[in-house]
Amino acid sequence: MLCYLGRGHFFNTPNLRPYQSLLLSYYRKMEKRTQPKWFTPVQNAQDGQLPNLYLYNSLTSRKDLFIPQDGRHVKWYTCGPTVYDVSHLGHARTYVAFDVIRRVLVDYFNFKVTYVLNITDIDDKIIKRARQNHLISDYQLKDPDLATVVGDIAKGIQKIKSKIQFETDSDKKAYLNSEVDRLISLLSTVPLDEEDPINYLILNARDAIADTLDSAYGASISDHQIFEVLARHFEKEYLVDMESLNIIPPSVLVRVTEYIDAIIKYVKQIIDNGFAYVAPSGSVYFDTNRFASSPMHFYAKLVPTAYGDTNQLESGEGELCITGEKKSPNDFALWKASKPGEPFWSSPWGKGRPGWHIECSVMASDILGGTLDIHSGGVDLKFPHHDNELAQSEAYFGHSHWVNYFLHSGHLTISGCKMSKSLKNFITIRDALKTHSSRQIRLIFLLHSWRDTMDYSVDTLAEAVGFEKQLIDFLYTCSNIQFLAKQSLSNKHDLEETENDDFQQTLVDIQHKVYDALCDSCDTRSVLDCIKVLMSEADSRIFSRIEPNKCISKLADDAFATGRFILQLLRIFGVADHTAVAAGSPVPSGAIIAGGKVPEHHESIPLREADESAFGFRSWLSLDTLTEERLISSVHKSLEACSIFIQAIIHEGDTFKEIVNTFAYEVQKQYGIDLFNVQSDERQSLECILKTTNQASLSESTCIPHGLEINVWPVVLNFLHTLISIRNTVRKVLSSGSITDSLCKKRLYEACDRFRDIDLVNAGIRLQDRATAIDLSRGLDISPFIGLVDKKFLISGHSESKTKRVETKVIKESVKQETGRIPPSELFLSEVDKYSKFDSKGMPTHDASGNELSKSALKKLQKLYIAQEKRHATFLKSKE
């Protein structure tokens, strides 16, 4: 009997010697079911200090200390899109996640990152989609009869049914079954009046017909320009989507079509190194078993348990691969012999095209060299794509460390199912941006760990929108406190200073907690929790202590420092714009960043002495940069709002006529604006205000960095306070009791409310009264808060319409119904980034690192499992 001793050694049993090689290969595979030892990169002492930054590394399934090869310089490659269709929120989740980490490395930890992104513009999916688009267009031009269309749909149904037999993914299988049911139902559906039945069928069964046509005529396609046209179109769409999401462009953007010669040379070298072979068709395959049996190498480093998973391997090969010519089912294509109807390039092995996996290896290696600091992509790419990348690259270079840190973003699910094009359950980025801003979408992702599975739902959206509202409200208050402090400074010798409780120490403590959270694998969720705590502390210890007739310069300092710190962090995360206040670093003094320690004397939040000149700069505390268009519009529309107000009150008696005339005179004197004759030229109103107050012109201010915020906004803010002062005067008169006519009072109160709630809102201006009727009757001079706030936010802030509430209820019911579709046994199976082992019921038993789950964790999961059983039972009952 041949006895295996480990590491390829056997007892020498003669009668089993012929099988030694086979058994050796088998047992080697069994040995390699756990991840190999990972060696921490060695830091060069000459490169200076580095932060104790840990990143969750898929090569070890743990958080590892991040040490780049070259000091501060980080070499990073990210798998880009295969450009055959529009991008969806699953893509957004991945690219926003890595955009945030990249920003943190550069703007917080002071690393220099070379970020390379590829465009996969040669792929089976692109080939098939381009051919189908071409064939379906020709099909419609030929004006097929009804019998032909019905017959082609029937063929499409049969093709889907044949796919179902071999499909192992439960979600895809469920989708394919539902698609068969839909198409069968479609064939018996009568279109609406006057709608052509042929066009109706083609429109609603386009994919099925296109698949039928491709099977029959795809090989006849000779115009290879269609592949280029499709790829360039969707590449452009992708780049526009990324810009819409505020994602920083890559340092280097590479395309597969630009690397054909380099790919051929790369493949040839792998063949020369003995790890690939040429098949009779002219395709070149990677010899997985040869690689796995090499003492230097290890196949499937990321997902060792997937070695031999032919279903996943086949999915990585694409739909158009040649079957039956590999030495082993584990082997994968480096170069594919092109068949009729496919693009091709000449190579030593005949006409062909690159395999999917080799493309990334060649492009990354060409730009970044033989070892990458970071490689990243979605968790669904772990195996086979990324494991195959690692294998072929290490076979090319002859070493075992092509990537030091592999980062994988978690799945984005919708109703518990992975969002994907194959399941037709995706939401495009552009559709998402129709209902939510790019800032809100980014906040959705920041409120969750970048590597965890997260569900896109009504609740996650509400959390992000709610947090954005908190930020806007907080910064609005901080800004107004600066203006109040400016007012109090004019009487600072006569006013008592509000007691200070050393809020700065609280701020410093939060700064260090944020630093620790970002060192913990860029834990943005904890950082946002810190921001929430800080805002709550500021509310109770700063905002609540603002009192009339008190000098609040120290409180204003604390409010400004807090707002600035939050804005600096959010700027780094890509949430806040690069305003004057948001500039600078939020890293605490004494902390380590790439290159050394932040000096102890360094003020991470530099505070100036509270004086009147400082508050103009401090007053623009906002997530948004200030634009010329926004200033022009707000000034002009606020003038229109004021004109409506004075027209409403001027005829309410001599008292109010005198108030209006006095007010109009002061506005004319201070700002050169005639309230009874507001100019139609919107820009001219603002230019007039700037000229009258001896300020630089609008065009001159826009040429100065942050000139609109520092020079123009303080003038506009003073103007807005002047403009609303007439409303304050009217409210004081009403509170004095001097107006006895109840109808007159009603009209005046309505005019005041309209000014605040309708006309100023339409101007994008938020006016918040702080003085109550009692305060006004006592003669207390309590200035209202005012500022520019997005009109959509103001409208939604006043009230949620009944229609909106109904829509929300419908969405929740829809999500609940869709969630019930998943059997409880499959509820956790897609969460491979959280769990590594499951029992026969589908319940997780071990976490992603292979450790057994605690009793408390199992108890929580059991509750979720039982709840899903009930939802699934309800779902099944609804289908009866």
Question: Predicted segments — roles?
Answer:
Residues 19, 23-277, 283, 323-324, ...:
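N-terminal Rossmann-like or analogous alpha/beta NTP/dinucleotide-binding catalytic cores
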Residues 230, 262, 266, 280, ...:
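Residue-level detector of well-ordered alpha-helical segments, enriched
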Residues 79-80, 214-221, 338-346, 511-514, ...:
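Short glycine/proline-rich turn/loop motifs
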Residues 26-84, 98-99, 233, 237-249, ...:
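Alpha-helical recognition segments enriched in aromatics with Gly/Pro capping
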Residues 166-167, 171-176, 181, 185-193, ...:
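Catalytic adenosine-cofactor/nucleotide-binding cores of aminoacyl-tRNA synthetases and other
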Residues 110-125, 365-381, 767-769:
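Glycine-rich phosphate/pyrophosphate-binding loops
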Residues 2-6, 10, 19-63, 69, ...:
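Basic, alpha-helical terminal appendages of large translation-related enzymes
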